[in-house]
């Protein structure tokens, strides 16, 4: 998974070649396992392109969007956004290992295109597909990869020197996707305890928190977070 973290960047333009049937079956299997474990209702769509027809906003134009995961769950679950980020990013990294391109999409789509059962909430979608490899796409990816990333010091509050495994975890957090590049989740190290929290005033900060928690666990090579704002990390 560490290699997938290093490799992953956001892709908004895909080739017209459909995702291989064997990869689709694997993604469906992973999604079912995640739903069983988490209580989420993540839905695979072979063609959700209708939601992106005519969409061109601040994140740039999407092209050849078809396959996606619709990220939803029970609306009365106070930890829904954190869970969506955590389990969704686990799926993103697994799809990266399949050499597929992925992108978290928070608002640049027509939400009315999706079916959401009563009692559930649509949080976001993850689009994915085969990576388009034009010169323009290569240049765009170079710009994305070079985006300014906050230092570990800017994203931690600590009362002592950070252990090596925590530093490794935070290096992985620095490579996590973040809504409008806010990089908001903060790690706190106090009295030997580790927790992570995010400012809930912005809609997608708690999704980012779940994403960051999963990256930290992989980078640290051990432990699990409580999946909530301010959740503790235990080994």
Would you name each region that the model predicts?
Residues 1-235:
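Acidic, surface-exposed loops and disordered segments
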């Amino acid at each position: 998974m560490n290699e997938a973290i290093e490799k992953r960047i956001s892709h908004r333009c895909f080739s017209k070649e459909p995702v291989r049937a064997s990869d689709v079956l694997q993604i469906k299997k992973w999604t079912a396992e995640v739903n069983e474990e988490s209580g989420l209702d993540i839905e695979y769509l072979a063609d959700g392109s209708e939601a992106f027809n005519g969409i061109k906003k601040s994140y740039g134009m999407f092209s050849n969007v078809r396959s996606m995961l619709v990220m939803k769950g029970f609306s009365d679950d106070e930890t829904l956004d954190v869970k969506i980020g955590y389990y969704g990013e686990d799926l993103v990294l697994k799809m990266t290992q399949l050499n597929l391109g992925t992108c978290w999409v928070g608002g640049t789509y027509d939400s009315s295109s999706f079916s959401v059962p009563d009692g559930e909430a649509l949080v976001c979608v993850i689009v994915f597909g085969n990576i388009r490899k034009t010169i323009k796409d290569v240049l765009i990816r170079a710009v994305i990869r070079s985006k300014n990333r906050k230092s570990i010091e800017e994203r931690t509050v600590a009362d002592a020197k950070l252990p090596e495994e925590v530093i490794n975890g935070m290096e992985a957090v620095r490579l996590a996707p973040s809504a409008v590049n806010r990089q908001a989740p903060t790690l706190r190290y106090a009295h030997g305890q580790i927790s992570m929290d995010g400012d809930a005033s912005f809609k997608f900060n708690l999704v980012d928190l779940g994403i960051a928690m999963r990256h930290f666990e992989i980078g640290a090579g051990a432990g699990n977070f409580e999946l909530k704002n301010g959740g503790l990390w235990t080994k």
